[in-house]
């Protein structure tokens, strides 16, 4: 919980700086932060180096500058990550990145979601569904599609913290409960 509060504060601080830096800066900083987070996710050893309290902040910052140079991070993002290194908070960067993405989505009026179906949908059908959902919500929707044969049929839509389960499996479970209760 404490890590989440700390990560939220850092994400809000970077987002506030990005808004002051210009119209395109929030999205650019977000891409840089996500790129750095994906490097850390792909290299657990690097994350261990940043999480190790025995390694000095200077060593962490030199490793950070090497990584930043290879992936081409913006100077403000490098400064932000250096601050995290000074405060021994670099292990929080994955959480900071996710929270920053949430702040950016809210500012841009974007919702993220996942649509689960029993079988793969054609690209044209995916586009139709996305357009229809965007019309209903009035917001831009970034939708990922997944396949789960266990739902038997129908769809399960997850957007934010809401879940709409219109799967055949869920309907069968409801029917089963009604039969048990004698309805």
UniProtKB/Swiss-Prot annotation:
<dbReference type="GO" id="GO:0005886">
    <property type="term" value="C:plasma membrane"/>
</dbReference>
<comment type="subunit">
    <text>F-type ATPases have 2 components, F(1) - the catalytic core - and F(0) - the membrane proton channel. F(1) has five subunits: alpha(3), beta(3), gamma(1), delta(1), epsilon(1). F(0) has three main subunits: a(1), b(2) and c(10-14). The alpha and beta chains form an alternating ring which encloses part of the gamma chain. F(1) is attached to F(0) by a central stalk formed by the gamma and epsilon chains, while a peripheral stalk is formed by the delta and b chains.</text>
</comment>
<keyword id="KW-0997">Cell inner membrane</keyword>
<keyword id="KW-0139">CF(1)</keyword>
<dbReference type="Pfam" id="PF00213">
    <property type="entry name" value="OSCP"/>
</dbReference>
<comment type="function">
    <text>This protein is part of the stalk that links CF(0) to CF(1). It either transmits conformational changes from CF(0) to CF(1) or is implicated in proton conduction.</text>
</comment>
<dbReference type="GO" id="GO:0046933">
    <property type="term" value="F:proton-transporting ATP synthase activity, rotational mechanism"/>
</dbReference>
<keyword id="KW-0066">ATP synthesis</keyword>
<comment type="function">
    <text>F(1)F(0) ATP synthase produces ATP from ADP in the presence of a proton or sodium gradient. F-type ATPases consist of two structural domains, F(1) containing the extramembraneous catalytic core and F(0) containing the membrane proton channel, linked together by a central stalk and a peripheral stalk. During catalysis, ATP synthesis in the catalytic domain of F(1) is coupled via a rotary mechanism of the central stalk subunits to proton translocation.</text>
</comment>
<keyword id="KW-1003">Cell membrane</keyword>
<dbReference type="InterPro" id="IPR020781">
    <property type="entry name" value="ATPase_OSCP/d_CS"/>
</dbReference>
<dbReference type="InterPro" id="IPR026015">
    <property type="entry name" value="ATP_synth_OSCP/delta_N_sf"/>
</dbReference>
<comment type="similarity">
    <text>Belongs to the ATPase delta chain family.</text>
</comment>
<dbReference type="GO" id="GO:0045259">
    <property type="term" value="C:proton-transporting ATP synthase complex"/>
</dbReference>
<keyword id="KW-0375">Hydrogen ion transport</keyword>
<keyword id="KW-0472">Membrane</keyword>
<keyword id="KW-0406">Ion transport</keyword>
<dbReference type="InterPro" id="IPR000711">
    <property type="entry name" value="ATPase_OSCP/dsu"/>
</dbReference>
<keyword id="KW-0813">Transport</keyword>
<protein>
    <recommendedName>
        <fullName>ATP synthase subunit delta</fullName>
    </recommendedName>
</protein>
